[in-house]
Amino acid sequence: MKIGICSLGCKVNIYEAEFVANILKENNYEIVDFEDKADIYIINTCSVTNESDKKSRKMINRARKNNKDAIIIVMGCYSQLNADKIDADIILGNKDKSNIVKLIEEYKTKNNKITKIYDLTKTKFEEMEISKFTNHTRAFVKIQDGCNAFCSYCIIPYTRGRVRSKDKTSVIKEVTKLVNNGYKEIVLTGIHTGRYGIDINTTLEELLKELVEIPNIYRIRLSSIEINEITPGIIKLLKENKVMAKHLHIPLQSGSNKILNLMNRRYNKEEFKNMITKIKEIPNISLTTDLIVGFPNETEEDFKETLDTLNEIKFTKIHTFPYSRRNGTPAAAMENQVPPEVKKDRVHKIIKLSDKDEEEFYKSNIGKTYDGVVEVHPNGEVIVHTSNYIPVIVEDNLENNTIVNVKITSVDKKKVYGNLTNK
């Protein structure tokens, strides 16, 4: 049978969709493009914003249009919260994805709708392992699920449950397999990656110290980490161990202490900036961030404070989102919601700043030489991905997933160009 898979949202969803595809292939199902006519469609949904909900519904409807007789399977964050609103044959939340083959066979036998939604505050980490990724030069490893932070705007603790960590030995085993299968860059991902280990008596720092010692490992990248979870030991590893990618994605969310407090972010801008100063002692480090604008009660003065904070820090790139009101979160009930047109204007201002800072960072690297992983795009464009997250375009014909040295020669409108070198 042919199966089309669509995965929306974060890197954890990418990992889980890849895992599902792998076990289906192992059981003789054929994976086809989601837009093709298939016998089964799987939509791995996202619910981080209202826009994500809308896109999840859109893809469910598209699957029905592609083949009205197909089996429709909906899983993930949107279905965890909205199972009763979904027209599908099999509905899973954020558990039981590893049982996908069994559930499909059960549906084919009984032809009865299956809904599996669990209380995620009472579940353990669902073990998954991937040894090969489709169409990726980088390999993702999900080391953790769930979140205990309860930021006032965020629905994710309700869709993903509490922090649950993958056993450290299992992580090391999975990463070792991927390295032995030729993957040069391993991206550690999770819903709240920095809290890895709090439920199994270990830490992210301890895990990293063991992972960098795996034979032949080239690069480990952290997908995201909170500022108050960056330990002196992690900074030391980043500074001294070449296996650690010289890039961190650290969500700021706001540069105003008033707004950070309303968001329940557990740090102030001074603490954030102090830690950034320490991190910037790492040569050539690249720092990216997430930012929410138009949070309830955010005045022009608060927004200006955020702009000032961003100008002081100078991130390589700022991923900006207008605040999205999520029912069931404390922020949704707050007074002084910001009008959409104000949010839109603030988003544009942040994008403009981000574009400027990104280009400045790239230009500051002209003349520098880095080693990196080659990625050959379907259109033939060859990109070398450096440790500090610079995508360098080269004119050479290179083999995918190889390691080369590249000297950055020029930057044009955020496009970085370089030449191969023997260093």
Model-found features: residue ranges?
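Proteins enriched for Cys/Gly/acidic motifs involved in redox and nucleic-acid/cofactor modification
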Residues: 1-194, 233, 244, 248, ...
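Conserved SAM/AdoMet-binding glycine-rich loop
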Residues: 72-76, 81-82, 86, 180-300, ...
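Glycine-centered loop/turn positions within well-structured domains
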Residues: 98, 149, 194, 228, ...
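Short flexible coil/turn linkers enriched for glycine and charged/polar residues
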Residues: 134-136, 147-148, 244, 254, ...
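Terminal RNA-binding accessory module
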Residues: 333-423
